[in-house]
From Swiss-Prot:
It holds the Pfam family Herpes_UL32. InterPro entries: Herpes_UL11/UL32. Belongs to the herpesviridae large structural phosphoprotein family. Its main location: virion. Residues 397-549, 659-945, 1006-1032 are annotated as: Disordered. This is Tegument protein pp150. GO terms for molecular function: structural molecule activity. It is found in: Virion tegument; Host cytoplasm; Host nucleus.
């Protein structure tokens, strides 16, 4: 709050303000001790009323500044109490002559303490000092004052006069300026005096310091209140004769009583707040032509002019208006202006023109001195300065207004508000801005990734992690069970999930979860799914179930066509899946069960079967675990009811490809035995590609589209992140070949172990055995999958021995529940580490162990689209003699990637997790499952689909237990080129539309030509001996299937 002065020049106002600002640094803080400051209130050149107002404003500001710097004597008072106690302690031990009188003064010192009222401080200090001085004089036997009504003066005892003078000067300085007490450099501990006298002298100095500060402060406070009240009374009397509204308004403000500091501050606030209302009642100059703001002055000024001028020009003024006596002791002749001339007026009270006023004043006064000229020049200079400052202020306000307007304007259209720079890769036009439409500039909740792929292909195959967030926020959803308002869509809660522990592996961390955006809700409904935000550009296909949050096997077939409730099977991971090369993922232990199924509907599921494990023990499934099954999806979430999602894979097959994998090359090929491997490894598989891409596209074009599943990234795991005791790597081979190499040289054994690395092609086999300890998997990055035009294949892993013919086996993605028979508890799979150093092979230590341990992989969403990653099961290729193994020779042809365990719906809308159940092979009991197979029950009930899988190289690995069932074929004529003229066995999975729990049957057939094979069809298979070419063999197979179908109907 700044002070307001009227009619003062700039330098005068600055002088007044600086005095108040540096008041505590002045030698004397009394305002009346600075007469020059009081004269700057306009005493010499302003109207008396204006001078009084400026003085009132100065005293109010001065009093406020004094109270703001009110000295705090708390520490000094505490010191005084301590010194009083010291004097009393020494006084009780001193041998006074008059013990009774001394005892009374000691009691005064003992009772010395200060209350909360500071007004009593000086009185308490004075009483204590008088008693202390009397005790000191009694100790030195000095004469005391004995007169009635007189008290002992407070003085120092036994000190030199020079020392006393220095002490008095210091105390006087404290009295003049109580805000700054200078320390006294004087030693009061004199050796000639006793301890009691020295303690009394110190107490006297401290007490007098307190008394000077308190009493000088009280004196200044009383003076300020008196001067403020005096100025207020004078101004009220000055304004009493005024008849204007502003004068009466100011007079009413001044009538507020000022009794203390709070009331003084209230008066100051009122005067400053309404300054613009009454300012015109105070003239700013003593002459009209020097800048008087008010043209109406009261008659008392006219009376004063009459008394001074004595001219005939004012003879017409009525006599009753002329005051005959001075008011309140004021002498109009000896006015406070001290010779300054008041305003000049006409007889009728109106202002005269400038020339007439100048002539009248010259005639009345008789002089026009140089001082008036100097003041006029100064006034003009001041006016110019004021005008220049006003112009600068106006220009500054305009600039500030322009800046505010520019800040309020919307941002330029070149950069969208919600646009963010891509973190992984750039767009096709080589700029950092997002290429989405205008409606995709608001962050909205992630929906379940499922609908058409219009925006999915806009990224050019790059899966931006934030592209899923950019969806339409300006339109309302048109589909789904609920339609929530637009405001709720825009303000939906989200949280960026940091690397966290997954359900599948509580002790390990997901590598890609740091960029995963999850809603803060428990489930993902269709709240935000609609036609306007139906694109899926986050790398996942448009499936109604997000594989990142789906951990159950759910039957999503149409419930109206099912005779019984669908079976929901939940699995839990027991072993990690390792990533090798270009995305070939196999379990970390060959011959071990990966998933444990738990049928939800016991009526439609087979009898409970023991869960095969490494050691042959049974691991029951806890129903309260987080892997418990969930209810079937509603109809609006069924992929069968969303035709746009089903066609997503055909339009956007490149989105299934992971562009962020970093291929590494390794030139070393080793096969060593290591007891503590750095990473669990699995044998590389021999792969075969048997058809052209054009034909394969026609074969696999109409397959259903599903979502991609999370896989486990063991490549980026740390050395200590995996259990080294669970899987022991006996050898790992990394090929050092080019991309199109056909044959890979056999591995050479060196005493050095190599770690898995990403390679684009894997075409070799290495021996491996596993221990009986299971591992927990780790969900990792999405695995890169090839283009949809690749060829379906089968991967088998067997120990390498001599030279035999190629052995490739395959199974359909879904097997009837009737073919899944539990393995008896007596058949336990055991393993041991048996390595032959010379040949690089491993043999089974038990006769019941399968000769070749294979890992069964389930199809991923990319596998359904791409034949190169079709859902194939690496069944155990059991030979007739368990003691011998059938090692395959190196396979020719380009290698490809294999499917990975999945958590999403697959063929025909059936959700399959992990590997599909294996099929009993020849050489094993019908009711037995090998250690590498999985016990699970599924209920496929969907429209009939005929799927021809790649052939197997041996007839013994074919399936011949299921009765043949015919079904309409969906193969086109061009699909005949998909099969090569090789001696192999294929499996046809036939889906039946009948309402039964076993709607899928398997038909095995032999594709071998009689001219090349030299033998007839294998037992238990559909012989196609009459076919001369592979195309004829396919046609014969389809005709036989049609015939069987018609017969069944």
């Amino acid at each position: 709050m700044s002070l307001q002065f009227i009619g003062l020049q700039r330098r005068d106002v600055v002088a007044l303000v600086n005095f108040l600002r540096h008041l505590t640094q002045k030698p004397d803080v009394d305002l009346e001790a600075h007469p020059k400051i009081l004269k700057k209130c306009g005493e010499k050149r302003l109207h008396r009323r204006t001078v009084l107002f400026n003085e009132l404003m100065l005293w109010l500001g001065y009093y406020r500044e004094l109270r703001f710097h009110n000295p705090d004597l708390s520490s000094v008072l505490e010191e005084f109490e301590v010194r009083c106690a010291a004097v009393a302690r020494r006084g009780y031990t001193y041998p006074f002559g008059d013990r009774g009188k001394a005892r009374d003064h000691l009691a005064v010192l003992d009772r010395t303490e200060f209350d909360t009222d500071v007004r009593h401080d000086a009185e308490i200090v004075e009483r204590a000092l008088v008693s202390a001085v009397i005790l000191a004089k009694m100790s030195v036997r000095e004469t005391l004052v004995t007169a009635i009504g007189q008290t002992e003066p407070i003085a120092f005892v036994h000190l030199k006069d020079t020392e006393v003078q220095r002490i008095e000067e210091n105390l006087e300085g404290v009295r003049r300026n109580m805000f700054c007490a200078k320390p006294l450099d004087l030693n009061l501990d004199r050796h000639a005096n006793t301890a009691l006298v020295n303690a009394v002298n110190k107490l006297v100095y401290t007490g007098r310091l307190i008394m000077n500060v308190r009493r000088s402060w009280e004196e200044l406070e009383r003076k300020c209140l008196a001067r403020i009240q005096e100025r207020c009374k004078l101004l009220v009397k000055e304004l009493r004769m005024c008849l204007s509204f502003d004068s009466n308004y100011c007079r009413n403000i001044l009538k507020h009583a000022v009794e203390n500091g709070d009331s003084a501050d209230t008066l100051l606030e009122l005067l400053i707040e309404d300054f613009d209302i009454y300012v015109d009642s105070f003239p700013q100059s003593a002459h009209t032509f020097l800048g008087a703001r008010s043209p109406s002055l009261e008659f008392d000024d006219d009376a004063n002019l009459l008394s001074l001028g004595g001219g005939s020009a004012f003879s017409s003024v009525p006599k009753k208006h002329v005051p005959t006596q001075p008011l309140d002791g004021w002498s109009w002749i000896a006015s406070p202006w001290k010779g300054h001339k008041p305003f000049r007026f006409e007889a009728h009270g109106s202002l005269a023109p400038a020339a007439e006023a100048h002539a009248a004043r010259s005639a009345a006064v008789g002089y026009y001195d140089e001082e008036e000229k100097r003041r006029e020049r100064q006034k003009r200079v001041d006016d110019e300065v004021v005008q220049r400052e006003k112009q600068q202020l106006k220009a500054w306000e305009e600039r500030q207004q322009n800046l505010q307007q520019r800040q309020q304007q919307p941002p330029p259209p070149t950069r969208k508000p919600g646009a963010s720079r891509r973190l992984f890769g750039s767009s096709a036009d080589e700029d950092d801005d997002d290429d989405d439409d205008d409606e995709k500039n608001i962050f909205t909740p992630i929906k379940k990734p499922g609908t058409s792929g219009k925006g999915a292909a806009s990224g050019g195959g790059v899966s931006s992690i934030f592209s899923g967030l950019l969806s339409s926020g300006s339109q309302k959803p048109t589909s789904g069970p609920l339609n929530i308002p637009q405001q709720q869509q825009r303000h939906a809660a989200f949280s960026l999930v940091s690397p966290q522990v997954t359900k599948a592996s509580p002790g390990r961390v997901r590598r890609d979860s740091a960029w995963d955006v999850r809603p803060l809700t428990e489930t993902r409904g269709d709240l935000f799914s609609g036609d306007e935000d139906s694109d899926s550009s986050d790398g996942y296909p448009p499936n109604r179930q997000d594989p990142r949050f789906t951990d159950t096997l759910v039957d999503i077939t149409d419930t109206e066509t099912s005779a019984k409730p669908p079976v929901t099977t939940a699995y839990k991971f027991e072993q990690p899946t390792l990533t090798f090369g270009a995305g070939v993922n196999v379990p970390a232990g060959a011959g071990a069960a990966i998933l444990t199924p738990t049928p939800v509907n016991p009526s439609t599921a087979p009898a409970p079967a023991p869960t095969p494990t490494f050691a042959g023990t049974q691991t029951p499934v806890n129903g309260n675990s987080p892997w418990a099954p969930t209810a079937p999806l509603p109809g609006d979430m069924n992929p069968a009811n969303w035709p746009r999602e089903r066609a997503w894979a055909l339009k956007n097959p490149h989105l299934a490809y992971n562009p962020f994998r970093m291929p590494t090359t390794s030139t070393a090929s080793q096969n060593t035995v290591s007891t503590t491997p750095r990473r669990p490894s699995t044998p590389r598989a021999a792969v075969t590609q048997t058809a052209s891409r054009d034909a394969a596209d026609e074969v696999w074009a109409l397959r259903d589209q599903t979502a991609e599943s999370p896989v486990e990234d063991s490549e980026e795991e740390d050395d200590d992140s995996s259990d080294t005791g669970s899987v022991v790597s006996l050898g790992h081979t990394t090929p050092s070949s080019d991309y199109n190499n056909d044959v890979i040289s056999p591995p050479s054994q060196t005493p050095e172990q190599s770690t898995p690395s990403r390679i684009r092609k894997a075409k070799l086999s290495s021996p491996m055995t596993t221990t009986s300890t299971s591992q927990k998997p780790v969900l990792g990055k999405r695995v890169a999958t090839p283009h949809a035009s690749a060829r379906a294949q089968t991967v088998t892993s067997t120990p390498v021995q001599g030279r035999l013919e190629k052995q490739v086996s395959g199974t359909p993605s879904t097997v009837p529940a009737t073919l899944l028979q539990p393995q008896p508890a007596s058949s336990k799979t055991t393993s041991s580490r048996n390595v032959t150093s010379g040949a690089g092979t491993s043999s089974a230590s038990s006769a019941r162990q399968p000769s070749a341990s294979a890992s069964v992989l389930s199809p991923t969403e990319d596998d359904v689209v791409s034949p190169a990653t079709s859902p194939l099961s690496m069944l155990s290729s059991a030979s007739p003699s368990p003691a011998k193994s059938a090692p395959p020779s190196p396979v020719k042809g380009r290698g490809s990637r294999v499917g990975v365990p999945s958590l999403k719906p697959t063929l025909g809308g059936k959700a399959v997790v992990g590997r599909p159940p294996s099929v009993p092979v020849s050489g094993s009991a019908p009711g037995r499952l090998s250690g590498s197979s999985r016990a699970a029950s599924t209920t496929p009930t969907y429209p009939a689909v005929t799927t021809v899988y790649p052939p197997s190289s041996t007839a013994k690995s074919s399936v011949s237990n299921a009765p043949p069932v015919a079904s309409p074929s969906i193969l086109k004529p061009g699909a005949s080129a998909a099969l090569q003229s090789r001696r192999s066995t294929g499996i046809a999975a036939v889906g039946s539309p009948v309402k039964s729990t076993t709607g899928m049957k398997t038909v095995a057939f032999d594709l071998s030509s009689p001219q090349k094979s030299g033998t007839g069809p294998q037992p238990g298979s559909a012989g196609m001996g009459g076919a001369k070419t592979p195309s004829d063999a396919v046609q014969n197979i389809l005709q036989k299937i049609e015939k069987i179908k018609n017969t069944e109907e």
